[in-house]
């Protein structure tokens, strides 16, 4: 008995102990991005992995995407969830603990030759041992699925960062065009007001400039509101405090995939896209659960040695065997559930494949429409710019009125803004297509230990 107590004490000494977890009382947004040390080799895309992260000179499109991957609050939560899945995989691989049963009986009274009786037995759940391979296989597949789901979320976060970069760049270009137009209109409006004050013209002469100026102001303010929204969306995406400045530098140009590249990427999507690979791993996990449910329909067995002594001091040894009788249940309910779940996952996978093909071709067609639109705008702009320049000279020579000049300049302004919007839309479609097809994603090795949690560390 003493040896048993010592064994139990030793086992308890190896147990995990409770540690309290304190909830934060303030926000934890990043206020100094220069303190972020990024592990570029762990980035989800080949372009990101080959890029040097240096926030000291501003953020180009790739650096902004890298910042989003390492510092996004949503991705932090996703990595924590992936940690739970890995812990579950670890738990599934542990062997079941044996069960120890002890009993003691004392004799009432004092009969001659009587002694204290005891029983001791050790049993092991054989069924759990037999089911371990299926359970462990399902857990490992779920861990791979979690890792691939996280990789897909990182890739989509990269796309979101790129989209915001493109949007902010387009807003900057639009405001530059509107700013020049506002300045020109403001100058002519002031000249018209001075002419009215001197009695050279009537108030009607300044109406076209005033109307055009107010319209340009309205468009400027609309762009300013869009900038504010996009900037706060970016702050939330990359997890920085609102007062942190994120100067954007460099080009917003995006490589546009052609039809041949898209078709090739669609054909490779089942081997390249992390979300499809995650669904494959999920189906593999469900297949193992289905196998486990089939095995569980057979009798559950427990077995182990026993040792006993009765009150007459007779010792005995033997074994115990427990078998469940599969007469009514036979695990048929769980078998049906796991089979139906497996079929649902197969249909989900097929639906994802179909949606990929449909959406890819839609984006490809939209790219072609936008490219044609931009080409038409580029073809018409030089002539329109020439007409506007001639009208400006004619207005200065008092050969055309302000209404004619304002209409021509308004048409030129609208065409320039249309080109900026069309270029933005083309870049957004190209980013969406790359995000959908996942052509340059760095895939992890097929391993449950391929964790994606260590992408960044804070340096002091």
List PLM regions with ranges.
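Alpha-helical heptad-repeat coiled-coil segments that mediate oligomerization/polymerization in large
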Residues: 202, 356, 363, 398-402
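A glycine-/polar-enriched beta->alpha junction
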Residues: 70-77, 83-98, 120-138, 148-155, ...
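A short glycine-centered flexible hinge/capping loop motif at secondary-structure junctions
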Residues: 196-200, 395-399, 436
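Small/polar, glycine/serine/threonine/aspartate-rich low-complexity segments that form flexible
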Residues: 47-58, 101-128, 135, 245-259, ...
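Periplasmic alpha-helical coiled-coil/stalk elements that build and connect Gram-negative outer-membrane
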Residues: 132, 141, 148-268, 363-366, ...
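Terminal intrinsically disordered/low-complexity segments used for targeting and assembly
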Residues: 1-67, 224-264, 432-460
